[in-house]
A protein has these predicted regions:
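Portal/gating segments that form or line small-molecule/metal binding sites
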Residues: 1-89, 99-139
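Extracellular, beta-strand-rich glycan-interacting domains
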Residues: 96
């Protein structure tokens, strides 16, 4: 199972705020969450919660790799995911496609200045109303 392999997840402040910081408990049994934000932890945030707030993706990647040890570092999509992809630090992209068409929304990787190519999917798992895909990032 993929979730068992993740040691640390990197998210942006938007995801952290939308989830209310998962009430201080990282999601899906993940050990640590690194939050990229120019703002500090929310007032009253438990300093013992396994969340680390950093200013940029370089600090986030370094901290996440140290915290994860030999486990996977996962990066959420959105602006932070796009920044890490643009920095050439993403090995693979996993996405789940569901049959819902939105009229508008946010870009999967925020705003990217350059084109980034993905290989054909090397994993395709069809579930009930969901398609799980994994793509290697071309270098």
């Amino acid at each position: 199972p993929y979730w068992d392999q993740i040691g640390t997840t990197i998210v942006g402040r938007h995801v952290f705020d939308m989830t209310d910081g998962w009430d201080g408990q990282p999601p899906s049994g993940i050990d640590h969450v690194v939050v990229v934000s120019h703002r500090p932890a929310p007032e009253g945030w438990d300093p013992e919660a396994p969340f680390l707030f950093v200013d940029d993706i370089e600090a986030a990647l370094a901290a996440a790799q140290e915290l994860a040890g030999d486990r996977i570092v996962e990066v959420a999509a959105g602006d932070v995911g796009g920044q890490v992809l643009a920095a050439g630090m993403i090995d693979e992209v996993r996405m789940d496609v569901v049959p819902v068409v939105m009229g508008a929304g946010k870009r999967f990787f925020g705003s990217l200045d350059a084109q980034h190519m993905l290989d054909d999917p090397d994993v395709v798992i069809q579930g009930d109303r969901v398609l799980h895909l994994r793509f290697r990032v071309r270098r």
